[in-house]
């Protein structure tokens, strides 16, 4: 059965499941799922199926309306808490407050020149800062656009991610209180890959 709200930007279910599974710590099941760029809610639906409470937001009111439809369609007889709000990523700490036992799983927005988006990069950095305020012991699992050369997955190569050398991106991640636990490329199509990134707090 198809979801009631769909857009071409919707993330494949297999990638949504992958990102959520990578956000789990050993022998620890998260309670809260937070996505500040929820889009059509593809990742949130997978988290809902896994029994998590859902806290998602988007700046686009069309997406907010659509994801409410999709989550209502997906919830079935489950008793999960679901909250969907229109909100900038820069304000999600004020929106949700402190939430222990959370994971942050998201696919940041980027434009037509996807892997060269400085705006998208700033949104990603804002998400890092806000996540630490909400839960200082959480995990972030996400994907950033990268050039197809990253599929070679040579650890000695400074690949271009979102238009910048990976070393610069990682430095910025560290400066915002996170360390990269995993970095692995995933093929999207011939000329575009996405770099799957999992981050844990530095402390």
Language-model features, listed with the residues they occupy:
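Class I S-adenosyl-L-methionine-dependent methyltransferase catalytic core
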Residues: 1-203
